[in-house]
Structures are given as C-alpha cells and as structure tokens.
C-alpha cells in the first residue's frame, strides 16, 4: 500500500495541519483530507471520520470549519474521506455492502490501519459521522467494520430495508439526527433508491431506529422534548450500547 506523504505524523508534529492524502487500496487510488492537531510525544488521539453526501466530493463538508476547530480544541485526528466514482453504485458511497462490493469498507479499514501506524491512535475512540448519503454509509460501517468503529452519529440519512450481512461482532452505539420535514430523505415514509437494484427500498426513520433498538435488545426508553427537537434514547442494551434519536421538529 502506498501512503503519501509517508511520514506525515513527524512532518506535522508541531502544528495543526491539513493535507490531501492518496492511498492505494487494491486497484483503486483513494483520497482523503486529513487534519491533525499539534502533537506531543505519546499523546493518544481519537479519530473522527466525516463522510460527505451525494455529489459532495468536491465541496466542503457541511459546517466543515466547525469540525476543523475541534482538531486542536479536542485533540482529534479529523478525516474527510472522498468517494470514488464507480458506475455500478452511482459513483458514491456503497450501500448494502456484499462480498464483491467492499471497496469503501476496505478503504476505511485500510485507512484506520495506516493512521494507527503513523499516529498514537486510541483504538477505542474511532468515530464516524456523515451527512445524507454519507450518513447512510456510517450504517455500513456499523454493520461491516464494527470491530474498529467505536460509535456513529448519522445526520439526515437512513439505510436499506433489507440490509446485507449486518453481523455485530461488537455493538456500535448510534446517534441519529433527522428533520421531520426532510424533503429528500423522508422521515415518515419508505422510498425506493433510484435504479440502484442492490439497495432497493429505504427505511423510514422510525423503522430505522426500531431496527437498531431491536438488534441491540434495548430494554429501556427515555424521551425528552424541547421546542426544537424530541430526543428518544434507548438504553440497557446488549454490550452496554445505546441508540439515540434527535427528531428535529421544524427542519
């Protein structure tokens, strides 16, 4: 595997840095934006992956500047992976991953390993968030890379009704944020994903939350409301995991 620059951890040791990195994964040359904090020796760092939405590869991530502020403030490694243009999955993040469509899962798997080799990464704090289609891909990580992903926070996405091979070696705590009036990714209704046959029908948001609540065998439910959102929390789940859902009332 080729990683460029090779020793970026040492190169950017004493300053906040941004760089665009190329990473060869199988036959594909993948890219990602990397932000690292000012480092001190033996400092253990968490990773936060943020996955862009459909068509978002060439544009800043939503509120990207706010995320960048967290790099030094919270001492995190911030990564914006970039999707790869493939015709058979409409050129975006692969959903309903199967044994012959693991290119995006393999990308993140390899990327975690490379970052861990270059930095003192805290393997118990590897997080993923995403917007829209990127949000949907975080559920792929929860299903197919749960041995390395600590938790996910999904914003304005969903997942397929019939999810392939979602085997939990360890449960991944989930936060899902969604606007009740979302006109693109429906909150209340199932919908069909264009002509992408491998994906098919997509879940409405209440069904999405129920899927994970049932999968984790959560026994307790708590609700709290404000004028802006409703928060539903499922706790007392297997392996001390939990599922949280913020329903945004006016969005």
Locate each region found by the language model.
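Alpha/beta-hydrolase
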Residues: 49-51, 155, 248
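Primarily recognizes the serine-hydrolase "nucleophile elbow" in alpha/beta-hydrolase
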Residues: 63, 116-172, 183
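Conserved alpha/beta-hydrolase "acid-adjacent" motif
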Residues: 184-188, 201-204
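Cap/lid segment of the alpha/beta-hydrolase catalytic domain
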Residues: 82-103
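A domain-start/cap signature at the N-terminus of enzymes
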Residues: 2-47, 73, 96, 100-105, ...
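Short beta-strand/loop motif that positions the catalytic acidic residue
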Residues: 176-178, 182
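Conserved acidic catalytic loop of the alpha/beta-hydrolase fold
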Residues: 39, 106-124
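Short substrate-entry loop that stabilizes the transition state in hydrolases
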Residues: 40-89, 149, 161-162, 184
């Amino acid at each position: 595997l080729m990683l460029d620059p090779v020793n970026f951890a040492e190169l950017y040791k004493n300053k906040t840095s941004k760089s665009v990195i190329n990473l060869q994964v199988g036959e594909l040359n993948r890219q990602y934006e990397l932000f690292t904090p000012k480092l001190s020796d033996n400092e253990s760092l968490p990773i936060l992956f943020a996955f862009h939405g459909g068509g978002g590869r060439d544009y800043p991530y939503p509120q990207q500047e706010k995320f960048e502020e967290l790099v030094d403030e919270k001492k995190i490694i911030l990564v914006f992976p970039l999707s790869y243009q493939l015709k058979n999955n409409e050129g975006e993040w692969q959903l309903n991953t199967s044994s012959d469509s693991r290119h995006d899962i393999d990308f993140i798997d390899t990327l975690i390993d490379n970052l861990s080799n270059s930095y003192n990464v805290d393997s118990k704090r590897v997080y993923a968030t995403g917007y829209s289609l990127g949000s949907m891909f975080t559920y792929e990580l929860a299903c197919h890379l749960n041995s390395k992903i600590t938790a996910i926070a999904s914003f304005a996405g969903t997942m397929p009704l019939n999810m392939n091979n979602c085997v939990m070696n360890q449960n991944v705590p989930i936060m899902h944020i969604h606007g009740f009036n979302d006109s693109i990714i429906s909150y209340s209704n199932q919908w069909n994903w264009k002509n992408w046959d491998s994906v098919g029908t997509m879940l409405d948001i209440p069904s999405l939350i129920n899927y994970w609540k049932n999968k984790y065998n959560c026994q307790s439910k708590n609700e709290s409301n404000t004028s802006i959102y409703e928060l539903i929390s499922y706790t007392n789940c297997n392996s001390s995991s939990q599922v949280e859902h913020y329903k945004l009332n006016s969005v």
